[in-house]
């Protein structure tokens, strides 16, 4: 990648993130004019769970914002929850020379009781990682990838929760080049507004 290419990627990520926040904030604000724009904020860290040359070194700080423009929190049953997902927007920050991710998509939460829950999400991401098989990092093939995650969590009260999750990103062989993907596992602390 050229020096010019490296400079464009972070600027492209910033522009994409800003436009996604603006678009989602408009939807969320109109749906919940009386409520907070954000439904939940999560922060934490993850690490690569891959092995060999596909493993990423270091710890990845993470921040995720959730919006509830479809009223998922007020859904009365699982079928309503399924058709009324929350929207998430977040980042997993690469330390050292590892990939930074900016991701967005839909999230579904299943409550086992007032305290225990499971969550799944699906969407896409853009990253700053390695595209070709040049070194001991995942070769990702293209900058736009699918992003999915699953997790289990515990609510301490109506606001605070903790969740362990595993997230995977790859292009599902839809673009040319290698498809090592990135798989990270971690813990996040959440605050629900």
Give the residues covered by each predicted segment:
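Short coil turns and loop connectors of transmembrane beta-barrels in diderm outer membranes
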Residues: 37, 83, 98, 112-114, ...
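Cleavable N-terminal export/targeting peptides
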Residues: 1-36
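Transmembrane beta-strand segments that form the barrel wall of outer-membrane beta-barrel proteins
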Residues: 41-49, 84-95, 166-170
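Repeated loop/turn-to-beta-strand initiation elements of outer-membrane beta-barrel proteins
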Residues: 41, 70-75, 114-118, 158-164
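Outer-membrane beta-barrel translocator/channel fold
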Residues: 119-149, 153, 160-163
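Solvent-exposed loop/turn segments connecting transmembrane beta-strands
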Residues: 49-57, 91-102, 112-114, 174-180
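Outer-membrane beta-barrel "beta-signal"
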Residues: 59-65, 181-193
């Amino acid at each position: 990648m050229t020096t010019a290419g490296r400079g464009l990627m972070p600027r492209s990520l910033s522009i994409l993130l800003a436009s996604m926040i603006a678009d989602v904030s408009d939807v969320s604000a109109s749906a919940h004019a009386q409520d907070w724009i954000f439904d939940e904020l999560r922060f934490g860290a993850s690490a690569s769970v891959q092995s060999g040359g596909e493993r990423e070194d270091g710890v990845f700080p993470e921040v995720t914002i959730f919006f509830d423009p479809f009223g998922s929190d007020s859904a009365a049953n699982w079928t309503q929850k399924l058709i009324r997902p929350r929207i998430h927007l977040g980042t997993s920050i690469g330390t050292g020379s590892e990939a930074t991710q900016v991701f967005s998509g839909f999230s579904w939460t299943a409550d086992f009781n007032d305290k225990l829950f499971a969550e799944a999400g699906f969407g896409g991401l853009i990253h700053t990682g390695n595209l070709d098989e040049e070194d001991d990092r995942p070769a990702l093939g293209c900058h736009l990838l699918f992003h999915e995650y699953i997790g289990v969590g515990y609510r301490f009260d109506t606001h605070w929760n903790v969740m362990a999750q595993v997230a995977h990103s790859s292009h599902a062989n839809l673009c040319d080049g290698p498809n090592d993907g990135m798989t990270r596992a971690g813990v996040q602390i959440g605050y629900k507004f």
